[in-house]
Amino acid sequence: MILRRLVLAGSLLLATAFTSAKKADSPIITATRFDHEPINLFYFGDSDVVMLQDIKNGDVYVSRDAGVKWDMVNLDGLKGQALSLWSHPTDRTKAYILGKAGKHWVTNDQAKSWHEFSADVEFFQSLYPLVFHGKDSDRVLLQGQKCFGRDCKEVTYYTTDGFKTVDILMENARGCNWAVSTPIFGDGLNLSKEVNDRIFCIVPGLQSPWSDYNRLLYSDRFFKQDPGTEAPLDSGRAVSGVVRTASVKKYLLAAAKSARTSELALYVTDDGSQWHRAEFDGHRVEEDAYTVLESTNYSIQIDVVAETPSAPMGRLFTSNSNGTYFTRNIDHTNRNSLGFVDFEKIANIQGIILVNTVKNWEDVEMSALVEKKIISQISFDDGRTFQPLKAGKHDLHLHSVTHLSNSGRVFSSPAPGLVMGVGNTGGHLKDYYDGDLYVSDDAGITWRKALDEAHKYEFGDQGSVIVAIFDEGRTGKISYSLNHGKDWKEASLPDGIKIRARILTTMPDSTGLKFLLVGSAKKDSEVEHYVISISFTDMEERTCGKDDFETWPARLNEKNEPDCLMGHKQFYQRRKADVDCFIKKKFQEPVPQFEPCKCTVEDFECDFNFIRSTDGKSCVPARNLPVPEGACKKPDDKYMGSSGFRLIPGNACIREGGVELDKQIERVCTDTLTVPVSGEIAVQKTFFTADNYKGYFYLERKDSSKGDDETVIMITSELQIYITRDHGKIWKEIFPGESITRIVPHQYFDDVAYFLTNSGDGWYTLDRGENFRTFKVPIPPNQDKLPVLSFHPERRDWLIWTGAVECKTRGPQCHSVAYYSTNHGSEWHFLMQYVRRCEFIKREARGSSNNLVFCEQFENENPLNHHLQLLSTDDWFSEKKVHYNNILDFATMQEFIIVAVRGEKPQDSLSVGVSVDGETFAYADLPANVQIPVQRAYTVLESRTHAAFLHVTVNNIEDHEYGSILKSNSNGTSYVLSLSAVNRNTYGYADFEKMQGMEGVAMANVVGNVADVEKGAAKKYRTMITHNDGAEWTLLSPPSKDSEGRDYSCSTKGGKPTDKCALHLHSYTERVDPRDTYSSPAAIGVMLGTGNVGEYLTLKSEADTFITRDGGITWEEVKKDKYQWEFGDSGSIIVIVPESRPTKTLFYSLDEGKSWKEFQFSEVEMLIRDISTVPSDTSRNFLLWGNEVGNGKKPGIATVNVDFSNLKERHKQCVLNEEKPEADDYYLWEPIHPFQPNGCLFGHRAKYHRKRPDRDCFIGRELQHLDSIGDICECTRSDYECDYNYEPQIDGTCAPVPGLQPLDPKLICMEDPKAVEWYEPTGYRRIPLTKCEGGKQLHHIIPHACPNKEEEFLKKHPGLRGVGLFFVVMGPIGLAAAIGYYVYTRWDGKFGRIRLGDTGSGGFFASDSLFISIPVAIVAGVVAVATALPLLASSLWRSVKGYARVPGGSSSQRVYSSRAAFAAQRADYVGVVDDEDELLGAEDFDEEENDDRGQV
């Protein structure tokens, strides 16, 4: 495959052949001229048949005499249609031509005949189109994409009979692999037939298309009647975030990356069934920062990028035989930015490796501007030790893989022991053009100069012939040697041709006497391309006899004796260097001979469950050892167990008389447990020399991250900074005396945080506080309370720094300046001045450039005019684009960019600008009766369900604020009213919260006495809930009885809530810490809250605590009084502690709140200010934050770690079998819509893993809760919401907004050139989240052809012609008139309202009847159209809850860029940090970014 990257060309046109004069003592050279450069040249194995391709016109050529003569492949339909040419990697008879128009061709007889097959697929560069089975060459996967206009989706085909038949395997797969992907996969393991059929595919998550949610599915039946099973990558569990798979030798690898970290987890299997996580000797593996190298049959070689922000360097690791434990071989390997590593194994000789390393690595780590000094080293013992290359007494350095100059291997070939390279002697490697050609004929032990200047080279006849050609410019000759490169002769190219050599190659096994040279020549102003055949077959050389060969040892030890590796010595019969003969054994590769050795220490590796000790001399347990049957009745018992070693599988050493490291030894039973089970909850209290804490945040380890730390960082009221790596058991002060004034956690990567001083300089960590590095900034921080650091969502090391210059006197010349860095601040570059803020805009949902940056800049660089422009660039403002000239602010979310745009006049309403790609903006259509006066505000609530939610202020009088929630369509441009009178506070934050982990469930608090509030009365609140993403809202159903078994004072109606009797909960605006949400993404279906049952929400001091386990449909009272709560172990542990009153005890539940146990955590009463755990809620540790207040109290703030890890009920790991998910400790839970009798929610039935509440076990690392999306349901009214210019009524109906002028529904034809039709409005639109199919299509009823699209329209609707079309068009008009009159005179007073509520069967004119709904819409005369950007089909964002606020005029409250800043109370931060985002700020109070819920 390297070849098809190296030879990038136009195309070929066969022209003329030239042949040099035949001489008995020199090779025959034949040149064939082409008009364009050839690509995709390859040999069929064990043959002289060669193929290449003309990329310009798609022609394919074949030669059957090793390149002397060429013929075009003539096939019906092939002319001009070939896209690419591929050879089969293991079958020497097969090749493939992939075409442009869905037609493709395969040969099974080395291009003698071709078979055409069809597959509707387009190909793209990021995916290999052909994936081959390792042992059956007829089994092939074909991967690409299908495109319908701009809408493309991946598609994978498969064949089991060599493309005689082709079937679709799967759509939307992001890469598939056969389990048996190499010829040696599973050798010696007796694989079942199922594994031979097994295919692994990376597919999108069930609820999200983002790569962080990718799943790895496998099927043994080609996904037929089998949706696939998730691969149990991690201890039997599925893992999300799988980004790629790869096969090497006998291993299959899968790489996974969790959200909010750049660290990868690598999983390995050698049988396609059992997977293990690879461990890299404590080293982190970063995304796009590892390279799987050429490996052996018994280990994997991987180069991992060293943790440096500057020039790429790596560390070389080698695995044990099952690929699970990797040992470091050598540091500072040379890499390039493309991931290529200077590493090569010498062909067909075990254990010899040639690498390049960076000599001045310390200087390079300090600065990216330092040029690397590269040196070459070689290992003769499989990478255990390395030594310099020697040319005489001098060190030799050779150019390697990062500077490829030819196809195929860099140094070696199948010719035994012959190695060549271009380089120089001296202290380090120089430029390629300063190098000479060197050769070794003893596998790299000694080297000598072969030719001056750089040359391309190739081996033939098992090394009897070496051919070289000058590689520093044009030449008219070749050089060749017949004695291992000692002496050289020259031969001229025919007809005086002088070419620039591109490729010099020969047959893959290097056993022939023919070579191919590809190059280009200049003739006048034209470029000519040549394929030149070089043949030594007719030279007057005899055939070698027995005496012409020597037994050559492939490896020598330090005593110059044949060396042992993998239990044997290796030898070859090799032609002596100085004999005059050719071997002439064409297609017969040299066969190694082996001599067994006695077993030594090197023949053993660490056994399962063991890893190398620090000194590398022994193997120590890596985890709890399994308890032998019947052993370990007592802790002090002993048993016979593994020594920690095992013989490397495949090792052939002689046991007798050798070392026996794998002999069982006596072990004590304490080895089977790392920590004794106490059965009790552990407590650790720590006091600090400060009265309070200013804030804290978690640097959470993600599933793909190594280690087991639970890191928390706290800043006290005395500005001391502490860190704990074990969740508060041991705290350590960091940066004492350094005057840290800002702590900035990375907005998108939880491993990273910055600690800054007033000057802006400081420290940062990339590994959750394990190490800290210094950080330098280009200018001091700004003094305008603007965020100083902005982060890239996908590139961890890309930063924008907003500082200030000329500010010593704070005069008018003081202004902000933005700089950017792409290497963690090692280098800074000017971006823009007079900015308010700049942000990277790249999101996975957008196809935009990584470099896309938005900046708010004062117009004409003049802050006094108060006009902020919104600008963008994708080239660091070499060029810029102005989107808006006068904005208030903008908010970036995963799916949308929303801009608050000022009107031309001060009294004008704010406009909403929306973009989904960061390039094209459109104004959003808000309901006509919803305006945003300048002096008011709107709040961007969230955008993770294909729709944006805005809270628009209606009343902004202090203490009387409320507004309306608007919901957008899927591209954010058309909004409808979702809920009125939603409460907000003075700072603009609304009582609205999405339930985490479940689709479409949200709660909001509304003002229940709006009319009185408008007259000055205090607000009274009610809590509402939606189960269909805001389309319908209802009150919360109260419990039937309280926690003491007593009835409530009010009564419901048939178990349903009423205006007088419902459950009401205190919401977002009343929280001290905004991280204290109702729900957790880890505890599916469970929510807790404090409130009361009645007509309205009462005082918080009167609140009790409630829980729901079914997503908010039913509730129970947990305890009287108000409690703080936290979920642990994905909800299998719930802890509550009294709020605002002293206590010594907490309560915990192990069964989702059905029962509670009391636990005393302190001898002295404490006032607990907060309870916390890791943001994912997966830990069994909790932290209580508070002060002692009782008798014997100690001064200062204290933390109390409460550890449930040793609780006997939570010490055993729960078992989840992905193939039988309900067989063990889990069951499948299906959420339902409370008004849907068929159990459908958003058009499908989803099933979630939930732990059985009665099982005594712990869940552990984050569980993929969503198991499957089952049946897709037919569409019903619950899958629709009110369309634009319709609004919901109190009774659940939808009515047109009075007095509106209808929009033109034909706009869709103008906005989307591909649109064929437009539809008459019905008042309905699909909920963006729904997956329903068929059923009631309430949004698309009556179609009309777009102008000039009548023909396409009729093809789409072939029955609509002539009279039939007349009746289809005219019939509904007459029918609408008749039914409209009937409705007008007979209906129940709800004329024009379309109910989206319960689906009943009320007959012909039932309120849910499609027949009545449509005429009502027509008579109402309301036209709804989405003025949509044709940009985004569908997307989904995870559960994040940040705010980004756009305030009103000068009298409005000051901007809080996040709810964290609001919640932390700004006054507490004065003197610590100059802007809201910095100290534990906008992004630190949980994983919640300022990226998704924005107050604007």
Curated annotation (Swiss-Prot):
Residues 1384-1409 are cytoplasmic. The lineage of its organism: Eukaryota, Fungi, Dikarya, Ascomycota, Pezizomycotina. Glycans are attached at residues 190, 297, 322, 971. SMART domains: VPS10 (SM00602). InterPro entries: Sortilin_C (IPR031777), Sortilin_N (IPR031778), VPS10 (IPR006581), VPS10-sortilin (IPR050310), WD40/YVTN_repeat-like_dom_sf (IPR015943). It is a multi-pass membrane protein. Belongs to the VPS10-related sortilin family. It is found in: Golgi apparatus, trans-Golgi network membrane; Prevacuolar compartment membrane. This is Vacuolar protein sorting/targeting protein 10. CDD domains: Sialidase_non-viral (cd15482).
